[in-house]
């Protein structure tokens, strides 16, 4: 199943972070914080402005992004967890 977000919404798949501390201690899932880094899976058409023009979304499918800890709404599609959030909730795009 594919998903197409509406307006300025973006679908993101969280990227797993290292589960070992710098000292070599393995951090269990129950103690680990959810990662705030993810990969853009799908983007909407853009935000419709008050004057009727559409401002396109600035992120692209495949971009790795940084977002807030509580950003987005968690959804499950075909057994996979995703976040659906507004583009405004994305703080940065990783480059290079």
Curated annotation (Swiss-Prot):
Heptamer of 7 subunits arranged in a ring. Interacts with the chaperonin GroEL. Its main location: cytoplasm. It comes from the Bacteria. InterPro entries: Chaperonin_GroES (IPR020818), Chaperonin_GroES_sf (IPR037124), Chaprnonin_Cpn10_CS (IPR018369), GroES-like_sf (IPR011032). It is found in: Cytoplasm. This is Co-chaperonin GroES. Keywords: Chaperone, Cytoplasm. One of its GO terms (molecular function) is protein-folding chaperone binding. NCBIfam families: PRK00364.1-2, PRK00364.2-2, PRK00364.2-4, PRK00364.2-5. The gene is groES. Belongs to the GroES chaperonin family. PANTHER family: 10 KDA HEAT SHOCK PROTEIN, CO-CHAPERONIN GROES. CDD domains: cpn10. GO terms for cellular component: cytoplasm. Together with the chaperonin GroEL, plays an essential role in assisting protein folding. The GroEL-GroES system forms a nano-cage that allows encapsulation of the non-native substrate proteins and provides a physical environment optimized to promote and accelerate protein folding. GroES binds to the apical surface of the GroEL ring, thereby capping the opening of the GroEL channel. The lineage of its organism: Bacteria, Pseudomonadati, Pseudomonadota, Gammaproteobacteria, Chromatiales. GO terms for biological process: chaperone cofactor-dependent protein refolding.
């Amino acid at each position: 199943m594919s998903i197409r977000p509406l307006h300025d919404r973006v679908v993101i798949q969280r990227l797993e972070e290292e589960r070992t501390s710098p000292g070599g201690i393995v951090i269990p899932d129950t103690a680990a914080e959810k990662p705030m880094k993810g990969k853009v899976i799908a983007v909407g058409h853009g935000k419709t402005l008050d004057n009727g023009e559409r401002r396109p979304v600035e992120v692209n499918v495949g971009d790795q992004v940084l977002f807030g800890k509580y950003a987005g709404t968690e959804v499950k599609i075909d057994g996979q967890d995703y976040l659906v959030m507004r583009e405004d909730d994305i703080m940065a795009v990783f480059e290079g």
